[in-house]
A protein has these predicted regions:
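H-loop (His-switch) and adjacent beta-strand-loop-beta switch element
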Residues: 201-213
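Helix-to-loop junction immediately C-terminal to a conserved catalytic motif
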Residues: 52
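Conserved ABC transporter NBD signature motif
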Residues: 60-75
Length: 238
């Protein structure tokens, strides 16, 4: 096993003349839940897309289990990915969507039922995806991310569209995954919710402002992740 589940080393990404992220470096330990935080336009989605090979960095590299995403023999076994804004084919059922994902991942036939149960969609498996609420679609995205039984999850705004019960469910889901030895890198604006579940945080605003343990950032009961986050991002110029 490589030392880190995820490692980002000096990643810079430009889109033409626009600098999206600048010399980002951080590592995500095995068995941890790490929150990736930053204001809109800070480069969170760019960073996640670079890690999973959807974007090529201008310089630097990103590794999963010590290798670039493109070098993983069967990526779905190593990492499950759920990105905000990635849609589904609305005319097919949830089960069919997961069957397609299962075939692509080379997962056993029974895996679809397992992930449907894990995300609470068993009773809705035969519904067409276009009838799903935003929260149900989020759960379906998580189910697809789990289909290959990966050791690592990379999630972009998984709480979007979830009601309070759904957010509580998501918190439990992430904890259970980590307790089984899994690793999670999650980008979210839900700071209060993240504070209850993450072990470490990475705050970026095109570059890394903080990367480390939550307890090293929030050092007293009088502080919160939200207050320390705003101290960091409002104290920088871009």
């Amino acid at each position: 096993m490589h030392k880190h589940a995820i490692e980002v080393r000096g990643v810079t990404k430009r889109f033409g003349g626009r600098l999206a992220v600048d010399d980002l470096s951080f590592a995500v330990p095995h068995g941890s839940i790490v929150g990736l935080l930053g204001p809109n336009g800070a480069g969170k989605s760019t960073t996640l897309r670079t890690i999973v090979g959807l974007l090529a960095p201008t310089s630097g590299d990103a590794l999963i289990d010590g290798r670039p995403f493109a070098a993983l023999e069967n990526p779905a076994v190593h990492v499950g990915v759920h990105m905000d804004g990635f849609g589904f084919e609305g005319a097919i059922t949830a089960r069919r969507h997961l069957e397609i994902s299962r075939l692509a991942a080379g997962a056993p036939r029974g895996r679809v039922d397992e992930v449907l149960d894990e995300v609470g969609l068993t009773d809705d498996a035969r519904r067409r995806v276009k009838t799903f609420s935003t929260g149900m679609a989020q759960r379906l995205g998580l189910a697809a991310a789990l289909i290959g039984s990966p050791r690592t999850l990379i999630l972009d705004e998984p709480a979007n569209g979830l009601d309070p019960d759904g957010i509580r469910w998501l918190r439990g889901f992430l904890r259970r995954f980590a307790e089984r030895g899994g690793t999670v890198l999650v980008a979210s604006h839900q700071l209060a919710e993240l504070e209850q579940v993450v072990d470490q945080v990475i705050v970026i605003k095109r570059r890394v402002l903080f990367a480390g343990r939550l307890q090293d950032l929030v050092t007293s009961d009088a502080e919160s992740l939200e207050s320390k986050y705003f101290d960091l991002v409002e104290g920088t110029q871009t």
